[in-house]
Amino acid sequence: MEHYLSLFVKSVFIENMALSFFLGMCTFLAVSKKVSTAFGLGIAVIVVLGIAVPANQLVYTHVLKDGALVEGVDLSFLNFITFIGVIAALVQILEMILDKFFPALYSALGIFLPLITVNCAIFGGVSFMVQREYNFTESVVYGLGAGTGWMLAIVALAGLTEKMKYSDVPAGLRGLGITFITVGLMALGFMSFSGIQL
């Protein structure tokens, strides 16, 4: 149990997808204007990562890995396309659920919801799972932790962005300029976790 807790904490803080590896920055910067929208997208990323990482772990272990189907047959060259296909299917299902049950959030997320399919944080989580050879339970914990860390980062950035609306930001830095500086400072803060061994 302690191993899984340390893996979760490590994936949220020490190896944060957004602020340590800078993965998923396109949606991270674009949807961080309002806390409510950022929170909704963060929940969507948690759900997709929490399902995509273990689902792809099963596909990799039982289909793609060397000798998984037939001894001596290595289908790992299909990793990239297979993982993207599984992620795309999961995002489509999530999109249909949000459209049916949460239409306001679906409208607020707009084009960024389908872009979760190609969000490199999602694919990065799956790739790290393969590289680190996580088992199924570790994949579930890692997927949920990585999604939680990404959500924590985007909600924190959205909160800071909302507060900066009322501050006197120099004209040349308004918009993405001050956002890049803020993300850099947040990344420096998260870098302080890098020396922690769990």
Swiss-Prot record:
Q: Which Pfam family, an example, fits this chain?
A: Rnf-Nqr
Q: Which UniProt keywords apply?
A: Cell inner membrane, Cell membrane, Ion transport, Membrane, NAD, Sodium, Sodium transport, Translocase, Transmembrane, Transmembrane helix, Transport, Ubiquinone
The annotated topology with respect to the bilayer is: Multi-pass membrane protein
Q: Does the keyword ATP-binding apply?
A: no
The entry's cellular-component GO terms read: Gram-negative-bacterium-type cell wall; plasma membrane
What Enzyme Commission number(s) appear in the record? 7.2.1.1
GO biological processes: respiratory electron transport chain; sodium ion transport
Origin: domain of life = Bacteria
Please give the Gene Ontology molecular function terms for this protein. Answer: oxidoreductase activity, acting on NAD(P)H, quinone or similar compound as acceptor
First-tier enzyme category under EC: translocase
- According to its UniProt record, where is this protein located? Cell inner membrane
Q: Which reaction does it catalyse?
A: a ubiquinone + n Na(+)(in) + NADH + H(+) = a ubiquinol + n Na(+)(out) + NAD(+)
**Quaternary structure note:** Composed of six subunits; NqrA, NqrB, NqrC, NqrD, NqrE and NqrF.
Q: Which family does it belong to?
A: Belongs to the NqrDE/RnfAE family.
Protein name stated in the entry: Na(+)-translocating NADH-quinone reductase subunit E
Task: Write down the species.
Answer: Actinobacillus pleuropneumoniae serotype 5b (strain L20)
